UniProtKB/Swiss-Prot annotation:
GO terms for cellular component: cytoplasm. It holds the Pfam family His_biosynth. This is Imidazole glycerol phosphate synthase subunit HisF. One of its GO terms (biological process) is L-histidine biosynthetic process. SUPFAM superfamilies: Ribulose-phoshate binding barrel (SSF51366). Heterodimer of HisH and HisF. It is an enzyme of class 4 (lyase). The gene is hisF.
Length: 258
């Protein structure tokens, strides 16, 4: 069994890290470089940076801060937001990112997944899936979730999209359960379990972490490869070294903190 990954997520707006609840009411959490270095020093396995305004504002991610981060940290990092072409992905990767994550652009043009996989390899291509449980009990996909006023429902079942994204070349899936985002009540284990049953590539849980037990539940009950979280790390509610010690005590394999 490979070590499970602990992944802080940094939502970026205007070069600053912000965090909201269910994608609303964002609060400034600090400088992007300072937080990135802090998480690297604490033992994060990788980082995800999400330019939350890029896709809703129909612009590309700013590579200036990507270059800055690449000079400062020596752990893998992934960049998401506004990556809608091979050329944009190339700029992001050449600026120093290890992976790109696509979400709304892939929903608008699914063949983008294959284009990126063919150009850079599946190991560089992450597909982010924002999922909401609707009144009929089905989980369906949302797009442009970085801006609640522009978020759109997509008539596509989450589980169907996860299967299709893999077929097209996704090397990793990040499933963000929007109903749980920012409220710290735990990951949506039931949804993650159903995704895991269909997911042949690494699956990352996102949305809902509020206690160390929540990470253990996602790893033990849904068999995810990594757990992504934001507010509990930014606020200091959970420190990564303590989290890793706790997980080891639960017989969950994680990498050492150096």
């Amino acid at each position: 069994m490979l070590s499970r990954r602990i992944i802080p997520c940094l939502d970026v707006r205007d070069g600053r890290v912000v965090k909201g609840v269910r994608f609303r009411d964002h609060v400034d959490m600090g400088d992007i470089a300072e937080l990135a270095q802090r998480y690297r020093d604490q033992g994060a396995d990788e980082l995800v940076f999400y330019d939350i305004g890029a896709s809703p504002e129909a612009r590309s991610v700013d590579v200036a801060w990507i270059e800055r981060i690449a000079r400062l940290i020596d752990i893998p990092f992934c960049v998401a937001g506004g990556i809608d072409s091979v050329e944009t992905a190339r700029r992001v990767l050449f600026a120093g990112a290890d992976k790109v994550s696509i979400n709304s652009p892939a929903l608008g043009r699914p063949e983008l997944i294959t284009e990126l996989a063919d150009e850079f390899g599946v190991q560089c291509v992450v597909v982010g899936v924002d999922s909401v449980r609707e009144a009929d009990g089905q989980w369906r996909v949302r797009r442009f979730s970085g801006d609640p006023d522009k978020t759109q429902a997509v008539p596509l079942r989450t589980l169907d999209w996860i299967v299709d994204a893999q077929r097209r070349g996704a090397g990793e899936i990040v499933l963000n359960c929007m109903d749980s985002d920012g409220v710290r009540r735990g990951y949506d284990v039931v949804q993650l379990q159903q995704a895991r049953a269909l997911c042949q590539v690494p699956l990352i849980a996102s949305g809902g972490a509020g206690a160390m037990e929540h990470f253990a539940e996602a790893f033990d009950q849904a068999d995810v490869d990594g757990a992504l979280a934001a507010s509990v790390f930014h606020s200091g509610a959970i420190a990564i070294p303590e989290l890793k010690r706790y997980l080891r005590g639960q017989q969950i394999e994680v990498r050492d903190v150096y």
